[in-house]
Structures are given as structure tokens and as C-alpha cells.
A protein has these predicted regions:
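RNA-contacting regions in translation and RNA-metabolism proteins
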Residues: 1-181
Length: 181
């Protein structure tokens, strides 16, 4: 039995100054049974959605089960700002972790959406930082999931003129960019 030791910025709670709480996540080795269960779940779900999708499973260097989906009309699978893809990923994670001991992380992607979204968010962060510097007023972004908020925080963490923090409760939690004092 092999496992990968990983320090993650993922967090269920954030402390008052919004610094991410580091926690250790043990990723278990992905079993063939888990791969089969997740693959079957996705194929059945996508078939029920009336979609023709090819699924490619791979194990990332960090030990995550990475699943890339391809086919026509993948925009439907992505959904508004990736919400459908995120929901399907959540369900795939539940299926994977039901079928084995130890934690398995499942990452779903299609048409390189995750990388494109990350670039879009980094670009948005830089534009908002420029706007905050120019107008000298804080700017609150739209509500985002924890993964997307983390991208915004990371993109601006080395900016000497602005700071970021999150406000609100899930699912309406958003990043606020303010001028440093």
C-alpha cells in the first residue's frame, strides 16, 4: 500500500485574518475498483444527460485521480462558470471515497477548462487590483468557490499596494480587494 504525503492549502474554515489554514492530506493510492466505480458513475450520469463523452483516467504526480472528458457539446458539461463540472466532480469524489479506505482526490476537466479558468481569474485579479489602485476604493468580486477564491488571493499576494480577504458565507462568499494602508 503506497500513499502520498501532501500539504494542501485547502481549508474548510478560514481564520479571522483570512490566512489559509494548512492541513495535511493523505492521498491514498487509487485502486482499480475505485477507478472502475468512478468511470461507471460518470458514464451512467453522462448517458442520462444525453451526452456522448469519452473519458480518460490518469493518476497525477500528486496522486489525484485526474479525469479528462471529451466529446461534442462540452459547454453543457462545464455549465455557468464551471458549476456543472464542479458538481459532477464533487459527486465523483463522493463515489471514489466510498469505494476505498483513505482519501482520494478526483479532478474532472474538459477542453482544458480548469487551466483556462485559472488564467481568466488571474487576469481578472490583476485588472481589479489596477481598478482599486486607480479609484482608491475596495472592489468585491462575485461569489466564488474556495478553489477560485484561492487563485485570486494567490495572484495578488505579492502586490505591494493591495490586499485581499474573503467575506460572506458559502455559497455567497466573495473576495474583496482593498488598498493596503
Amino acid at each position: 500500500f503506497a500513499s502520498i504525503h501532501l500539504i494542501s492549502d485547502e481549508t474548510k474554515e478560514e481564520i479571522k485574518n483570512d490566512a489559509p489554514v494548512k492541513r495535511e492530506v493523505e492521498l491514498a493510492e487509487v485502486t482499480d475498483e475505485t477507478k472502475e466505480a468512478v468511470s461507471t458513475f460518470l458514464k451512467d450520469t453522462l448517458k442520462a444527460m444525453g451526452m456522448e463523452v469519452e473519458i480518460a483516467l490518469d493518476i497525477d504526480e500528486d496522486g489525484s485521480l485526474s479525469i479528462n472528458m471529451s466529446g461534442p457539446n462540452m459547454g453543457i458539461l462545464i455549465g455557468k462558470r464551471g458549476q456543472t463540472l464542479d458538481s459532477l466532480q464533487y459527486l465523483a469524489n463522493r463515489v471514489a471515497n466510498k469505494h476505498q479506505s483513505g482519501y482520494v482526490r478526483v479532478k474532472l476537466d474538459t477542453e482544458n477548462y480548469r487551466a483556462r479558468r485559472e488564467e481568466t481569474l488571474k487576469h481578472l485579479a490583476k485588472n481589479i487590483a489596477h481598478k482599486v489602485k486607480r479609484n482608491r476604493r475596495p472592489v468585491a468580486l462575485e461569489p466564488m468557490n474556495p478553489y477560485e477564491r484561492r487563485i485570486i488571493h494567490s495572484a495578488l499576494q505579492n502586490d505591494p499596494y493591495v490586499t485581499t480577504h474573503s467575506e460572506g458565507e458559502e455559497p455567497y462568499r466573495k473576495v474583496v480587494v482593498t488598498l493596503k494602508k
